[in-house]
Amino acid sequence: MSKFLQGSIFSISKLHVRYSSTRPFLVAPSIANSITTEAPAINHSPELANARKWLPKRCGLITRKKGMMPYFDKSTGERSAATILEVNNVEVIMHRTSEVNGYFACQVGYGSRHLSKVSRQMLGHFASKVVNPKEHVAEFRVKDEKGLIPPGTLLKPSFFKEGQYVDVRSVSKGKGFTGVMKRYGFKGLRASHGTSIMHRHGGSYGQNQDPGRVLPGRKMPGHMGNEHVTIQNVKVLKVDDENNVIWVKGSVAGPKNSFVKIQDAIKKT
């Protein structure tokens, strides 16, 4: 075994076959595994690792997508597509703290739900936090304890300001099992000139006996949609506390009445 360690870790396993260099190790493997750094352990603590994360400073909102409408800017007359997001009885339920959970976050609930449609576990959770049962619950991570909002606080559309940028998260529409032309925009093969039953095929999926397999990441038919999608730097066009809606520029992934999470844009703060 000592003779094996004198060379490379990939030593000769077959006669007259060399797989890599036979240069000796600079440090024996047994010694390398026992080397410890002189840096204090606090540099690698979960608290400092969490502090290094790029996180928003404020909590976010849960909204419901109601549809799209054109929006006209009064100052410039510019017309742009806008998505209308409804804010209905959004309330802070509880906190996550670094001392207990290892990170800071606010748990937020949307709307209200009848007691008969809430599981016993969630009923106990809402009762312990002294809030009414919610239709949807989500968690928003924040940078530190300054971003925590007192439980029971109702959040309104004015939580965001007109003109600011936000990150929008939602689940896209499910398209089912689709081919490569619909899923990835492949051109497909010829319609005629000898092409048979391969018109919408993806072409070659591999090479030859070497490597003898389909390489990872190959674009192939499969389930399309129903994925978590984040759109960054979306502009807030209008905030309406009277009607409890937020207008954001452009489209948002997901069908109507789907839940959408909004938080301050991480790349604009």
Curated annotation (Swiss-Prot):
Residues 1-19 form a transit peptide. GO terms for cellular component: mitochondrial inner membrane; mitochondrial large ribosomal subunit; mitochondrion. One of its GO terms (biological process) is mitochondrial translation. GO terms for molecular function: structural constituent of ribosome. It is found in: Mitochondrion. Keywords: Mitochondrion, Ribonucleoprotein, Ribosomal protein, Transit peptide. Its main location: mitochondrion. It comes from the Eukaryota. Component of the mitochondrial large ribosomal subunit (mt-LSU). Mature yeast 74S mitochondrial ribosomes consist of a small (37S) and a large (54S) subunit. The 37S small subunit contains a 15S ribosomal RNA (15S mt-rRNA) and 34 different proteins. The 54S large subunit contains a 21S rRNA (21S mt-rRNA) and 46 different proteins. NCBIfam families: L3_bact. Component of the mitochondrial ribosome (mitoribosome), a dedicated translation machinery responsible for the synthesis of mitochondrial genome-encoded proteins, including at least some of the essential transmembrane subunits of the mitochondrial respiratory chain. The mitoribosomes are attached to the mitochondrial inner membrane and translation products are cotranslationally integrated into the membrane. PANTHER family: 50S RIBOSOMAL PROTEIN L3 (PTHR11229), LARGE RIBOSOMAL SUBUNIT PROTEIN UL3M (PTHR11229:SF8). Belongs to the universal ribosomal protein uL3 family. This is Large ribosomal subunit protein uL3m.
